Amino acid sequence: MSKGVMYVDNIRVEYDNEPNVLEVCRKAGVEIPNFCFHSDLSVYGACRMCMVEEEGTGKIDAACTMPPKNELHIRTNTARLLKYRRMIIELLLSAHCRDCTTCEKNRACRLQEMAVRFGIHHVRFDDTREHVKICLLYTSDAADDLI
């Protein structure tokens, strides 16, 4: 970890020992949506919701796994990132029980909150839960054959 200056949505932010760009953004008061990051746990980077776009190169990367870099310029809210995040939420919803009224997390669900925040009222993708089960069964069977 180190010290330096980054630019988050044109806001100059000094960082000092923040382990990743997500924490630098939080320090700047810029909230980036995420599902899997928690500062007390090891970085996982699986949800991909915290993607940021590097100015100049257009490269996108997960802010939770990206170390801060001096003079780095990033964008957190481009049209490309919003489209990307909407698709991630839709994919998560496609593998999620859609009968929220019977779920104990109803109205206290981060996925519901994100869907509302990003204006998702309809999921374009088919229900993928059965496909995931089949894939897991196939993987388990293949693993059993190796033992």
Model features per residue range: what roles?
Residues M1-I134:
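Signature of N-terminal electron-transfer/Fe-S-associated modules in redox systems
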